[in-house]
Amino acid sequence: MAKAKAKQEPQQQRQTLQATYRFVLFFIAGSLAAFAFHALTSSTGSLMGWRLRLHHLPTAHYLQTRDEFAVYSVDELNAFKEFYDKSISDSVGASFTEAEQTNIKEAMGALRLAQEMYMAGKDDKAARLFEHALALAPKHPEVLLRYGEFLEHNQRNIVLADQYYFQALCISPSNSEALANRQRTADVVQTLDERRLISLDEKRDALSAIHEANSALRRAKKEAYFQHIYHSVGIEGNTMTLAQTRSVLETRMAVDGKSIDEHNEILGMDLAMKYINASLVQKLEITLKDILELHRRVLGHVDPIEGGEFRRNQVYVGGHVPPGPGDLAILMQRFEHWLNSEHSSSLHPVNYAALAHYKLVHIHPFVDGNGRTSRLLMNTLLMRAGYPPVIIPKQQRSKYYHFLKLANEGDIRPFVRFIADCTEKTLDLYLWATSDLPQQIPMLIQTENEGHVLAQLQPHIAQSIPELHESGSGSGSGADPIRVP
């Protein structure tokens, strides 16, 4: 009996030891599984969180950027995801064509040489090399980052530098250097933008103080009316000169050598602008019906069947693919809600008008006339806030479309600043036209004798308007400048 009990004790000890081993192994396995699960489900992403902690970067602006996505719909978020996925796939060398890979290699070489020139103090050569690298690889994060740093520290162009940092982050969200640079520039750029808007308000108030009966103001408004129509249809490819545009509007007579459609585009804009002046400017809210009525007048002479109607087919605008026709009704309802929301009305009028322009042209609800209708809506909102209708010069067509493209890629700010530029130039022209200056004041377009007109201005005036005109060829329209008595 004692022997049997002695044999059982070692056996029980072995069983107890085995049970202990199994418990320890189970505990270790469970701990590893829990750690792995926690790492995979961390809220900010393990890689990005690790990099942020490693470099001790502040995350306030990054989190603020993420919070802004809460206002977007599911469709808009999906569009952002598609753009991000495409950007990620584009960053993989295997996805590039042979020609694109060659361009990237050349861009990297130009980038290295640009940095060498910069370190050697040869800033002009460095600037040209940076621009060359950007032209070869406009979506390469390293090119965007290094060129932005050059602009920030050497050229003192912090606004453009911030724009390139933002683009680099859109393409490579975990780029720690781009994050750090953006943290440094974001507040400064926001302050500059706010100061610009305050300056616009001051000029608007100065213009509003001029009595409506002022003869110079009345002449300026009449000239600006012709200019607005001329430039808006010109952006869309209309070849009428300013003098011909004025003739069509004043005489309703045909111009030899010009198509019927070009005449009708001008007449349609005239109808739409008269509708704005007579009705929309006084309305408290802009409805979907108002937008359709505006578009119906834009196409009233060109295509009366499609005027005021949503498109029924898919369209393609360069690299942008607008929503399908089945989504237009709900998207336009959302746009109408945004247009009249309390949040939108709290925005600065220039920001509000520029955003409305972009949102409508991004949806692209019509077969034709989307750009003209969007610009008319923008000016309606500006006029309700006391601003004059803003003229976007046809000579800046490429800039206009470039900034719209940047907005499609995720950064609306360059487009808003472009609209602010056009707003300020329009305000300046009104103020100069109603001032006591005895000289001729040119309008926004370029003419063959533009250089002579500017040379006739007093030196201190000429110095105050260095960016009145875009460089490039003139329109040859022979437009009359405003003459101030």
UniProtKB/Swiss-Prot annotation:
Membrane topology value: Single-pass membrane protein
Reactions catalysed, as given in the entry: L-tyrosyl-[protein] + ATP = O-(5'-adenylyl)-L-tyrosyl-[protein] + diphosphate; L-threonyl-[protein] + ATP = 3-O-(5'-adenylyl)-L-threonyl-[protein] + diphosphate; 3-O-(5'-adenylyl)-L-threonyl-[protein] + H2O = L-threonyl-[protein] + AMP + H(+)
Modes of activity regulation: The side chain of Glu-236 determines which of the two opposing activities (AMPylase or de-AMPylase) will take place. In response to endoplasmic reticulum stress, mediates de-AMPylase activity. Adenylyltransferase activity is inhibited by the inhibitory helix present at the N-terminus: Glu-236 binds ATP and competes with ATP-binding at Arg-375, thereby preventing adenylyltransferase activity. In unstressed cells, disengagement of Glu-236 promotes adenylyltransferase activity.
Renumbered ranges of TPR repeats: 107-140, 141-175
Site-annotated residues for Important for autoinhibition of adenylyltransferase activity: E236
GO molecular function, one term: protein adenylylhydrolase activity
Residues annotated as catalytic: H364
Purpose: Protein that can both mediate the addition of adenosine 5'-monophosphate (AMP) to specific residues of target proteins (AMPylation), and the removal of the same modification from target proteins (de-AMPylation), depending on the context. The side chain of Glu-236 determines which of the two opposing activities (AMPylase or de-AMPylase) will take place. Acts as a key regulator of the unfolded protein response (UPR) by mediating AMPylation or de-AMPylation of Hsc70-3/BiP.
Protein name: Protein adenylyltransferase Fic
